[in-house]
């Protein structure tokens, strides 16, 4: 049972109080639901990003719908002083983050390098709509990328034959899945990728402490019996969740820097240093919230619906970027082996951890590599 709770908390909520996972008070749930609902489509016009605004690009807030009727909020970045139709890139992630954090930084930086870019909040999170709030869905979150392609392809200054996508962390997996489904996507990149369906079903397939080289040794994932117990736990909680319209939430994660101890896994401490400090905190991000986390039934689909089942059929050019010392490195290594694209590359950033690629605090995001990749497949070869 200990591993089950580890999987359940570190993947979706990282909740510090196991018993409260299925026993949030009704008042807390109602307040959280009301607050998120009222603010779901209030688009903040002021610059509230964790990174400075570039003078090299134009920025606009935009909205668009996916095929489920959910309205997504996004930031559109366009390089200044350009003419004609340009290549475009849709960006999202990390899992539990918002467009004002990592995805916006990636989007703005790539716009400085000549692309029209779109950083969007996934369905049910941030400024995007969707009820109940904070509900992950492998299908809908994959669809969000295709909806972003729809939007970009409708713009007069975008060549719809030159659209790519980029997913960060958990949205790296969803980006690969979107490229498998959507043949309009001409290039797919990932940064510090997670496969959220795999980690939800199997837990972390690593030892929780790095080895002497600073990397993480592999271990077997969850057994079918362990997954069965997880599903029983969540489905028992679902009775109460159904009474509240599925708007009951896991407690806030345990990323408060004050709770980090020497016994805390190193990568959890790194998450805390990003999401709960001035460095990367944003009030709309699930992972930054001190009040509540994901919807408590949200993990069910992630456990049961693997996203990369047909990875061998992928033909889209792919670039998978990961840190050498990231606990999550095995996701990119395995995905690289699985995907069938003849034009694929696994690029390992020396000495970088998972969170090093969330922002450029350590100067380790290989923007030159991303630029080279997207220009090759969206500009030079078109």
What do the predicted segments below correspond to?
Residues 39-84:
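N-terminal cap/lid segment of alpha/beta-hydrolase-fold proteins
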Residues 135-156:
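Alpha/beta-hydrolase active-site loop
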Residues 350-352, 360-382:
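Catalytic active-site module of serine/aspartate enzymes centered on a nucleophile-bearing elbow/loop
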Residues 96-108, 122:
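The serine-hydrolase catalytic nucleophile loop
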Residues 109-127:
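Conserved alpha/beta-hydrolase
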Residues 85-94:
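Short beta-strand element of the alpha/beta-hydrolase
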Residues 314, 320-322:
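Short beta-strand/loop motif that positions the catalytic acidic residue
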Residues 177-276:
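Alpha/beta-hydrolase-fold enzymes
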């Amino acid at each position: 049972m200990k591993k089950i709770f580890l999987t359940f908390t570190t993947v979706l909520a990282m909740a510090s109080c196991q018993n409260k996972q299925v026993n949030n008070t009704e008042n807390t749930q109602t307040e959280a639901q009301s607050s998120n609902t009222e603010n779901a489509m209030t688009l903040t016009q002021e610059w509230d990003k964790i990174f400075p605004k570039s003078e090299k690009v134009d920025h606009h807030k935009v909205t668009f719908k996916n095929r489920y009727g959910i309205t997504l909020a996004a930031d559109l970045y366009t390089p200044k002083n350009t003419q004609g139709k340009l290549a475009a890139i849709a960006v999202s992630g990390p899992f539990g983050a918002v467009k004002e954090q990592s995805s916006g930084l990636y989007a703005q930086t790539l716009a400085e390098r000549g692309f029209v870019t779109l950083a969007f909040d996934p369905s049910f999170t941030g400024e995007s709509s969707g009820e109940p709030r904070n509900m992950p869905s492998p299908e809908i979150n994959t669809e969000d990328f295709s909806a972003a392609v729809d939007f970009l392809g409708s713009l007069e200054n975008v060549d719809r034959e030159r659209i790519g996508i980029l997913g960060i962390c958990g949205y790296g997996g969803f980006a690969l899945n979107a490229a498998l489904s959507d043949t309009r996507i001409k290039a797919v990149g990932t940064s510090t990728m997670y496969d959220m369906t795999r980690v939800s079903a199997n837990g972390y397939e690593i030892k929780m402490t790095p080895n002497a080289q600073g990397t993480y040794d592999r271990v077997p994932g969850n057994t079918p019996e362990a997954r069965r117990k997880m599903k029983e736990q969540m489905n028992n909680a679902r009775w109460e969740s159904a009474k509240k319209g599925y708007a009951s939430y896991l407690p806030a994660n345990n990323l408060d820097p004050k709770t980090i101890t020497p016994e805390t896994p190193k990568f959890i401490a790194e998450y805390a240093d990003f999401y709960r400090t001035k460095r990367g905190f944003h009030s709309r991000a699930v992972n930054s919230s001190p009040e509540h986390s994901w919807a408590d039934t949200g993990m069910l689909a992630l456990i049961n619906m693997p996203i990369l089942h047909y990875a061998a059929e992928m033909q889209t050019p792919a670039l998978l970027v990961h840190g050498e010392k990231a606990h999550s490195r095995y996701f990119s290594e395995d995905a690289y082996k699985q995907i069938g694209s003849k034009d694929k590359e696994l690029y390992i950033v020396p000495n970088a951890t998972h969170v090093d690629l969330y922002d450029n605090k350590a100067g380790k995001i290989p923007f030159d590599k991303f630029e080279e990749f997207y220009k090759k497949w969206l500009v030079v070869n078109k």
